[in-house]
Amino acid sequence: MLEAINLSKSYNGTAALHPLNLKIEPGEIFCLLGANGAGKTTTINLFLNFIPPSSGNARIGGLDVVDRSLESKKLLAYIPEQVMLYKNLTGLENLEYFTSLAGGEHTRTELAGFLAEAGLARADADKRVGAYSKGMRQKVGIAIAIAKKARALLLDEPTSGLDPKASNEFSAMLKKLSASGAAILMATHDLFRAKETGTRVGIMKHGHLVATYATSELGHADLERIYLEHMHD
């Protein structure tokens, strides 16, 4: 579970995130929508403990990410817009390295299986990451989450720049991870992808979470209309 309790962040007296209360249950995919500067990435960074909160708490699996940093990180996987991998290593070698940092011990056969589960072909797993497309790098990121058995997954604009086929494959993998019990928080500008992937969406504006909706209750046109209404308020 991911939980924000009166979570806020200010810089020199200017609020980047006003007090946020949000709970994302296991099996949920919550998509944060909003313009640049709305507070989406700030929210992600607070859960990652990349920046300290000005007030409140961010919790992963009930563990405060500041007070229980090492323990909470073991429950977590993170996929940014550009997955940071070592270009001179293969996809398999990258997966082996990053899972070992998290304390995982897997055979190369098991690691290849995680990559295959994430949609990366066996032949591609043995290629250097420098030759990978963005979609292939994202699959390595998903494989890391699978190998860690992550209970929470944070994503910041993960489908930006992906072609429709790769975006659909990525969404399918997120749904598979959520079905296994992971709580997922994804920041995105893509209304279509949020509707197709998320179980809930939240709209952020000027550091406030101004509205949340269940995607099952909205059509694509409904979400676009509601989003634009909030942006023009």
Where are these regions (language model features)?
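Conserved ABC transporter NBD signature motif
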Residues: 56-67, 71-72
